């Protein structure tokens, strides 16, 4: 059986603020911002190059704002990605080496959205697999 992850739901307290953060600062593509009915709003955005999107909204059972931890993005060049995110106004950690030097995928940086949902940005290198 083949399965693909389609959407990650992020609980936020202010949809417009989160939409601006993810689309304008982080650089996600806005897929849609719709109101299926008077009590619901669904905003879906996709990271560039990703097949999986994030959804935020109103009237959705998404949990407490800021409760999602450790969503992960993968990039080819972490230094460049960190510089770009920082230049766009995203507070991002220093690059951290979390495994042996040269190990596949051992470099990370971290950021949070305005509600405290946290993200890891991982550099996927061509080093040996563990």
Describe the residue ranges of each PLM region.
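N-terminal beta-strand motif that seeds the catalytic metal site of vicinal oxygen chelate
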Residues: 1-19, 68-71, 122-130
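Core segments of cupin and vicinal oxygen chelate
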Residues: 2-3, 9-52, 87
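Vicinal oxygen chelate
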Residues: 3, 32-34, 41, 73, ...
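Helix N-cap motif at beta-to-alpha junctions
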Residues: 14-15, 75-79
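Short amphipathic alpha-helices within nucleic acid-binding modules
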Residues: 21, 78-84
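Short, charged/polar surface micro-motifs in flexible loops or helix N-caps
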Residues: 48-52, 62-63, 78-80
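Helix-adjacent hinge/juxtasegments
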Residues: 58-75
């Amino acid at each position: 059986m083949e399965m693909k992850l389609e959407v990650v739901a992020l609980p936020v307290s202010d949809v417009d603020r989160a939409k601006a953060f993810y689309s304008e600062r982080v650089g996600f593509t806005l897929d849609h911002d719709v109101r299926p009915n008077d009590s619901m709003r669904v905003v879906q955005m996709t990271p560039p190059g990703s097949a999986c999107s994030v959804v935020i909204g109103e009237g959705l059972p998404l949990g407490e704002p800021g409760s999602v931890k450790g969503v992960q993005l993968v990039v080819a060049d972490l230094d460049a990605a960190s510089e770009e995110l920082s230049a766009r106004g995203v507070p991002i950690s220093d690059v951290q080496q979390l495994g042996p030097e040269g190990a596949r995928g051992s470099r990370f940086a971290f950021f949070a959205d305005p509600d405290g949902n946290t993200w890891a940005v991982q550099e996927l290198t061509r080093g040996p697999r563990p």
